[in-house]
Amino acid sequence: KNLASWRVNASNKHHALVVGLSDEEAIKNVMKSWNANRDLGTGMHKCFEQYLNDEPVAQEANFQAEMSQFHVAMDSLVGLTPVRTEMSVFANDAKGDAAVAGQIDLLMRDSEGGLHIVDYKRTPGDLSPNAHAFGKFFLDDLPLNDHHKYSLQLSLYALMFELQTGQPIVSTRLVQVHPDLDEVRIVPTTDLRGDARNLLEGAG
């Protein structure tokens, strides 16, 4: 189904990967692209983590555009100080087993001691609340776009962090970087902790 729509829609980001190819060749092309993007995202995250932990940034030469945008982002987060990178969070079910888990990219503290979550996204796409959702909705009739999906992700992280530490999260935001962007984008997420709490209760 997806392959057919990608082939006829020249504006789709997968169109060039599948048009004129057999299903097998098209799937192979798409998987190769997805894997490459995943690896680039992982490499970028590692560069940011190493920089924040005062370690040598081994792949900095391969991520010059991303690192440049990252420095601009960090400079713009005035009053926030990095506290912890790559922090695992989880919530247990009734049996005490981890039912939901995630990893906070960066935890920051403000001048009053409040804690904030920052999540890195390597994408040139629209991460605004009004981004196109192709007529799809979820939760309380919210557009099912990347902004709201990532907002739910970070709301879950915020709740799990509070469950683990007893400390509330003041805010969550996305730091969006990509070589195709003219500049870094810092996107405040939508607070979906009410929906996230319902999901955690359902999982527990």
Residue ranges and their predicted role:
Residues 5-9, 50-54, 76, 163, ...:
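A structural signal for alpha-helix termini and helix-coil/disorder junctions
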Residues 19-22, 72-79, 145-148:
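N-terminal start-of-chain detector that recognizes signal peptides
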Residues 26-139:
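Catalytic cores of nuclease domains that cleave nucleic-acid phosphodiester backbones
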Residues 1, 60-64, 143-145:
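Secondary-structure junction/capping motif
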